[in-house]
Amino acid sequence: MSSAPLSSHASGSGKTTILRLIGGQLKPASGEVLVGGQSVPDLEPDALYALRRRCGMLFQFGALFTDMSVFENIAFPMREHTELPEEIIRDLVLMKLHAVGLRGAAQLMPSELSGGMGRRVALARAIALDPMLVMYDEPFAGLDPISLGIVGQLIRRLNDALGITSVVVTHDVYESLKMVDQLYFVSEGTIVASGTPEEVRASTDPYVRQFVDGAPDGPVAFHYPAPSYHDSLFADVDA
C-alpha cells in the first residue's frame, strides 16, 4: 500500500535535512537511512546514482530551468537518464503534462507561468521517470488557496495512481491533513509526535495542538533563546 508521510514543523527543525539524507547528499551521524531496502550512506557512487534515478524531487518554488520551455524541463531527466528516442520522450512528456492538467502549456516558458502552474510543471518533472519515491520540499509555499488545493489534490492522486511513496515536507498542517496517511512532527532533528490524520486531530499533546491550532503560545517559544532582557539592558550600566 502506498503512503504519503509528512514531516512538519518550524523552520530550521531539520525537515529538509531529512530529504538530503534520503537522497544521499548527507550522511547521518548515527542511525540508518534505508530506501528500498538499501542503506543509502553505504552505497557506491554508481549505486547511489541509480537509486536517485528512482526518486523524484519537487523543490521549493519548483526550481524550473528558466531558459527551457515547459516541455524541455520535463524532457530533461528523460534525456539525462535514458536513451529513449525523441518520439517516445515527446509522448511521455505530453502524458506527464496531461496528468497535471497542463498539456496545453508545453511550449510556454517558466516566466509565463503562474505560481501554481509552475509548481504543477515541477510536479510533472518529478514523476518524469516513474519513480518509486517522490520527495516534496514545501510544495505549498507561496501558493494562493486555489492553487494550493489543486497541488495537494494532485500529490494525493498521483501517489495513489502511480503506487509510489510520497514524503512531503511542509508547514501547512491543515492542507496536509486532507492528503496524507501519516504525519511526523519534527523538532530540532527529532520526531516529537506522529500519527494518522484522525489521531492528530484528536491529539491532546501540547506540541501537536499548538501546531494544528496555530497557537502563538505553547512548547514552541516565540522568543529565540537569549540572555535575560533585563541583564542585556543593564549590562553596560553594571559594568
What do the PLM-derived regions correspond to, one by one?
Residues 23:
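Helix-to-loop junction immediately C-terminal to a conserved catalytic motif
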Residues 38-39, 86-105:
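Conserved ABC ATPase "signature" region
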Residues 40-56, 86, 200-203:
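ABC ATPase NBD coupling module
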Residues 109-113, 117:
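Conserved ABC ATPase signature
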Residues 130:
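Conserved catalytic motifs of ABC-family nucleotide-binding domains
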Residues 134-137:
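Catalytic Walker B motif of ABC-type/P-loop ATPase nucleotide-binding domains
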Residues 213-239:
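ABC ATPase nucleotide-binding domains
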